[in-house]
């Protein structure tokens, strides 16, 4: 059994950020509006030790979220979005934030780009461990 909570998490973030930012999955090269948030899962592997005749009990899951903002308040806007996202993924769901950093946006340096990665072990009942 594959445990996959990425659609659920994306839907929750979409609802949370609805009036504040455009959120997309997958990334668009030229978004029409800012702030712009992308969501992608980068890991969904079985935990081998948890497999028995009933199937896999635990899955390693990872998400990457990128925040793009523009304008005079771009840094503040990105940090506000980061806080909301972190409260949802770390606070509410229990995922471990493994990366949280500003990344240069090579295509357009007027765009502030911030990357956050979360990881966790999810059981067959969708409970998160880290």
Predicted segments with their positions:
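Intrinsically disordered, low-complexity segments enriched in small/polar residues
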Residues: 32-34, 66, 110-112, 116
């Amino acid at each position: 059994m594959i445990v996959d909570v990425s659609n659920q998490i994306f839907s929750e973030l979409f609802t949370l950020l609805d009036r504040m930012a455009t959120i997309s999955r997958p990334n668009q090269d030229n978004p029409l509006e800012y702030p712009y948030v992308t969501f992608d899962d980068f890991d969904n592997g079985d935990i081998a030790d948890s497999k028995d005749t009933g199937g896999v009990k635990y899955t390693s899951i990872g998400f990457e979220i990128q925040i793009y903002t523009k304008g005079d308040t771009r840094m503040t806007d990105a940090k506000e979005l980061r806080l909301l996202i972190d409260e949802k993924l770390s606070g509410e769901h229990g995922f471990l934030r493994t990366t949280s950093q500003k990344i240069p946006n090579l295509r357009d340096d007027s765009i502030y780009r911030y990357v956050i990665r979360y990881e966790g072990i999810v059981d067959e009942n969708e409970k998160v461990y880290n």
